[in-house]
A protein has these predicted regions:
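An N-terminal boundary/leader segment
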Residues: 1-54
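Generic hydrophobic alpha-helical segments
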Residues: 12-16, 59, 159
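Enzymes and membrane/adaptor proteins characterized by extended Gly/Ser/Thr/Asp/Glu-rich
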Residues: 37, 71-111
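Flexible, acidic active-site loops/lids enriched in D/E/S/T/G that coordinate Mg2+ and/or position polar
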Residues: 49-72, 79, 98, 102, ...
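Short glycine/serine-rich loop segments
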Residues: 104-171
């Protein structure tokens, strides 16, 4: 399975469609990778394990029935914490939004879900995405996987760190 987790996005989508790997295994593989690296990176600020695994099981079941939900069918992803997600808190890295749960997905999130992607969690961002480094009062600083004394930058620092650590295919 490790070689499939190391493939590019196209390779992963082809592996799922050819039944070389299930969406459940792919999602669990990336959840395991996130768990392994996130304590040192602080890249993922919230995780959606139970829902992600249920959606992956549904993607696998649908694929067996010949139903494909789009080009990203069953592929795990994360999303920046500045994008609204109906099933997860969206803080924008600011204290005033620590418990804010939007009523709907941002358009980009909805389109990714419609394309079949499975949202695993949210990645860290500077407050209001307005800094050259990813640090905020809600979740703290994100570290660069190649040098933990440095930041991966901003405003998508959580996403950048996670992708650089090969812990998610895209964000």
């Amino acid at each position: 399975m490790e070689d499939i987790l190391d493939r590019n996005l196209r390779g992963m989508t082809e592996a799922v469609r050819r039944n070389e790997i299930t969406s459940v295994d792919l999602v669990q593989g990336f959840l395991d990778r996130i768990e392994k690296v996130n304590s040192s990176l602080n890249a993922v600020v919230s995780i959606n394990t139970e829902i992600a695994l249920k959606l992956a099981a549904k993607a696998d079941s649908d694929l067996k029935e010949g139903i494909v939900h789009g080009p990203l069918h069953g592929i795990p992803m994360t999303i920046k914490d500045s994008l609204d997600t109906k099933d997860m808190v969206t803080t924008w890295g600011t204290k005033g939004r620590e418990t804010f749960r939007p009523g709907r997905d941002a358009t980009s999130v909805a389109r990714l879900r419609d394309a079949g992607a499975i949202l695993l969690g949210k990645t860290n961002t500077p407050e209001f995405t307005l800094s050259f480094q990813t640090d905020n009062l809600v979740y703290g600083r994100t570290n660069n996987p190649y040098n933990l004394e440095m930041t991966p930058g901003g405003s998508s620092g959580g996403a950048a760190a996670l992708i650089a650590a090969n812990a998610i295919p895209f964000d």
